[in-house]
A protein has these predicted regions:
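Zn2+-dependent metallopeptidase catalytic domains
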Residues: 1-256
Length: 256
């Protein structure tokens, strides 16, 4: 009953997080930035307070696993694990430290997203001639023209995806245009100014290392992958390394 009530109480928060994650990824505007940031701060604080709640954890931990069916048992185990990984078994002072770290990480993550969004908008690729877009569909070219018009610019504007490898690189026939797109994509976050993310990345890395240390892990990578299939950073690296030779062989075969 305790776990069911706990899960039910978190449903509205999960739905709100999903909504704002979608909004932030696809429809974030400068006007909405502060409101979205405030929502993330409140959601993070609520989640942290919940997962570091010792009394609530003790009630959930009391649920006997032997009485659960095969579907509920792993769910209960995961619920307990989430509390433990958040730091609920730490002493009072360390729990307070973990809460502070989580609040700082949320603020840094929001700042990072804001800066990345700024640079992504500023580095959208402006092109003057339709020939430079050869290979794209008519709809894509029309969308690029519309995007340029929305900024009161002539020609065409290719927006950038959140990830480095851009979707338009495949169909674009112009090597110069492909180079322009990829160069702008890779430049994000490292040009100085409001769109620079290097300070946030550095601070997030330091805080994650401190977080892992408080929880007894040698590194954040060890903490992050501890409950995953690989089980540890070295094992994960071995898995990735084992793919290199087959990938090179496949590449050589395709280039032959």
């Amino acid at each position: 009953t305790t776990t069911v009530r706990f899960e039910s109480a978190t449903v509205p928060m999960a739905r709100l997080a999903a909504l704002f994650r979608t909004l932030e990824s696809n429809h974030l505007t400068p006007e909405l930035t502060d409101a979205v940031a405030e929502v993330w701060v409140r959601l993070s604080a609520t989640r942290t307070e919940m997962l570091l709640g010792v009394d609530l954890f003790h009630r959930i931990e009391q649920v006997p696993f032997t009485d659960l069916n095969p579907e509920d048992k792993p769910h209960q185990e995961l619920t307990v694990e989430n509390f433990v990984r958040a730091g609920v078994r730490l002493g009072e002072e360390d729990r307070a430290h973990m809460a502070t770290i989580e609040a700082e990480l949320t603020a840094l993550s929001t700042s990072f997203s804001r800066a990345l969004g700024t640079d992504t908008r500023e580095l959208a690729v402006h092109l003057g001639e339709a020939d430079e877009l050869k290979g794209l569909s008519e709809d894509q070219i029309a969308a690029a023209a519309t995007r340029a018009g929305e900024r009161d610019e002539s020609g065409y504007l290719l927006g950038l995806n959140n990830f480095t490898q851009q979707l338009v690189l495949g169909p674009l026939e112009s090597a110069a245009t492909r180079e322009h797109v990829l160069r702008n994509s890779m430049a994000r976050g490292a040009r100085g100014g409001d769109g620079d993310t290097r300070a946030q990345v550095s601070d997030i890395t330091a805080l994650r290392a401190l977080q892992a240390k408080l929880l007894g892990y040698p590194s954040y990578s060890s903490y992050a992958i501890d409950n995953q299939t690989a089980g540890g950073p070295d094992a994960a690296a071995d898995i990735v390394s084992s793919l290199i030779a087959p990938a090179n062989a496949q590449l050589a075969a395709e280039l032959d």
